[in-house]
Amino acid sequence: MNREERLKRQERIRNFSIIAHIDHGKSTLADRILEKTGALSERELREQTLDMMELERERGITIKLNAVQLTYKAKNGEEYIFHLIDTPGHVDFTYEVSRSLAACEGAILVVDAAQGIEAQTLANVYLAIDNNLEILPVINKIDLPSAEPERVRQEIEDVIGLDASEAVLASAKVGIGVEDILKQIVEKIPAPSGDPDAPLKALIFDSLYDPYRGVVAYVRIVDGTVKPGQRIKMMSTGKEFEVTEVGVFTPKPKVVDELMVGDVGYLTASIKNVQDTRVGDTITDAERPAAEPLPGYRKLNPMVFCGMYPIDTARYNDLREALEKLQLNDAALHFEPETSQALGFGFRCGFLGLLHMEIIQERIEREFHIDLITTAPSVVYKVYLTDGTEVDVDNPTNMPDPQKIDRIEEPYVKATIMVPNDYVGPVMELCQGKRGTFVDMQYLDEKRVMLIYDIPLSEIVYDFFDALKSNTKGYASFDYELIGYRPSNLVKMDILLNGEKIDALSFIVHRDSAYERGKVIVEKLKDLIPRQQFEVPVQAAIGNKIIARSTIKALRKNVLAKCYGGDVSRKRKLLEKQKEGKKRMKQIGSVEVPQEAFMAVLKIDDQKK
């Protein structure tokens, strides 16, 4: 192809993604677009075609982003090339969203005609605005009896400030309005700007590991072209590779001769090491490299940490391999080895949030068949010592000695909660119970309110989301962003079993709620830990001070069964002998802690409600 043909082709490319709150119909709309452009035959279409992972289909959510190339014949006879990049809607996966938006020029904003704007809609729209994308509002599900398209249109204008007069009214389920959406994509979304003759610049926005071809990098070409046989260089590491194959997804991978400006596709270059293709890195030509890399993504810091240990310690290396493979296409996962006296060898893993943690855990158990024990999630605390040094603590067992601590700061988040009027009371109560401070409250319309609170992240990590949903019968939606660290009065609580600290059960808690929490945990553990032959005290302690205790009663055999009648001193002798034996057992006996006990420490709040 000569330069002219390339530029002509470039003008007909449209790169866009679909953004929406969970359940507003994003994946269904993607299905309709695939169907309308003839990317898949009727036979191949299944619901949520782009959600390839079994877990995604089961939970009905999108976790990974996915890219597809489609061809669309417009009314004017021109053939356009669409690249649709599907994005997740859940708050834990905003990073995935920001990655897919960086590879686009436009975004379709899907809003449910019955529910209106939700918290995550807002979060994702702001990401799109930051990336200077052209946003096309679509009001979906207009076939529902409860749909109020006009109210939602007004809401889009008032809350986001987008002009919604030309918003498409659609129903992805029945296929209404899909043609209009395709028409708007052609008319409103700009073609990619890039120079086909400049040195190659390609953004890696995802990657996955293929046992036969090595690492497969998903790329968006910004400048130049890439074809097999070309030497490429990673700009962050400076490593060089030779391209072996390039292709596009139509949803299935299809090999092509070259990828040009604006294309979204994949390339393989016999890259064996997972670490060499960092998501967000720029690929350039090794012979004539680009002057500077593309502005990458911001470095992602995990917010929530927990320990993961294989139940069978011999599978420690399998777990490491599993985590490495997952990390390859999940840039936000972070892990390092750690050991625990109670659980043996394992890893300390960092996640973006609780859903992220749950999904990684489930993927390890499903895809790699490793049974896991996970410890209570914790956040990163900044601990300032009396000698002026500062330590980051993401594991309660690493907390320095209380005498050496000057102050502890914990991460706070700004929580945006959208909630129907009737539930404002319970939600405010919940936020205050979680040590939240009230910031702002706005009425979106006569039925819905937006509440903004500053809440410690550690309070959200446990079960804030579940509590919020149950307090509002599932109507509230919620989104949060980190706003920095603030000093708090925190203490580390240890749990002692039979006088021994169980390191995996330690956690950090606010001093005011320490006593309550200690009491609840001790009671709960008493029910969960199986009874032993001797009695076991369960204690909660702050430093050396025991603040709560309960006792697991011993199992005992009836030693008097064989004495029919007989003298009382004979019975006493047998009882004394049993007591002696139990005492000896207690000195050498150890207690097994079941997995439920670790999870119980998290879910204590159930008791309080």
UniProtKB/Swiss-Prot annotation:
| Chief location category | membrane
Where do the tr-type G domain residues begin and end? 11-193
Catalytically driven reaction(s): GTP + H2O = GDP + phosphate + H(+)
Q: Which domain of life is it from?
A: Bacteria
Hydrolase recorded as keyword: yes
Q: Which UniProt keywords apply?
A: Cell membrane, GTP-binding, Hydrolase, Membrane, Nucleotide-binding, Protein biosynthesis
UniProt cross-references to InterPro entries, sorted A to Z: EF-4, EFG_III/V, EFG_V-like, EFTu-like_2, LepA_C_sf, LepA_CTD, LepA_IV, P-loop_NTPase
Which molecular-function annotations from GO does this UniProt entry contain? GTP binding; GTPase activity; ribosome binding; translation elongation factor activity
Q: Does the keyword Cytoplasm apply?
A: no
Which PANTHER family does the protein's record reference?
TRANSLATION FACTOR GUF1 HOMOLOG, CHLOROPLASTIC, TRANSLATION FACTOR GUF1-RELATED
**Protein's job:** Required for accurate and efficient protein synthesis under certain stress conditions. May act as a fidelity factor of the translation reaction, by catalyzing a one-codon backward translocation of tRNAs on improperly translocated ribosomes. Back-translocation proceeds from a post-translocation (POST) complex to a pre-translocation (PRE) complex, thus giving elongation factor G a second chance to translocate the tRNAs correctly. Binds to ribosomes in a GTP-dependent manner.
Q: What is this protein called?
A: Elongation factor 4
